[in-house]
Amino acid sequence: MAVPKKRTSKAKKNARKSVWKKKADKAAKKSLSLAKSVLQGKTTSFVYSLYIDELFSI
């Protein structure tokens, strides 16, 4: 017969959520930093095109 599982504690739930939030915060900071460097023209981490026409030509 099926038995209900025990409830997850608030501490465990909050710990898991904080790990997820820290990971998301790190990704957001990294993407913002990359966007700033692209706008300033100082990026060296990847190759990209400055012209929109080159992006969509197949």
UniProtKB/Swiss-Prot annotation:
Main location: plastid
Membrane-spanning segments: none
Subcellular location field: Plastid, Chloroplast
SUPFAM superfamilies assigned to the protein according to its UniProt record, in alphabetical order: Zn-binding ribosomal proteins (SSF57829)
Pfam families (alphabetical): Ribosomal_L32p
Xref: InterPro entries: Ribosomal_bL32, Ribosomal_bL32_plant/cyanobact, Ribosomal_zn-bd
BP term (GO), one: translation
GO molecular function, one term: structural constituent of ribosome
Keywords, sorted A to Z: Chloroplast, Plastid, Ribonucleoprotein, Ribosomal protein
Disordered, as annotated region: 1-23
Disulfide bonds: none
Cellular component GO terms, alphabetical: chloroplast; large ribosomal subunit
Family label: Belongs to the bacterial ribosomal protein bL32 family.
Family matches, as PANTHER family: 50S RIBOSOMAL PROTEIN L32, CHLOROPLASTIC, LARGE RIBOSOMAL SUBUNIT PROTEIN BL32C
Annotated NCBIfam families: rpmF_bact (TIGR01031)
Protein name in UniProt: Large ribosomal subunit protein bL32c
Lineage: Eukaryota, Sar, Stramenopiles, Ochrophyta, Bacillariophyta
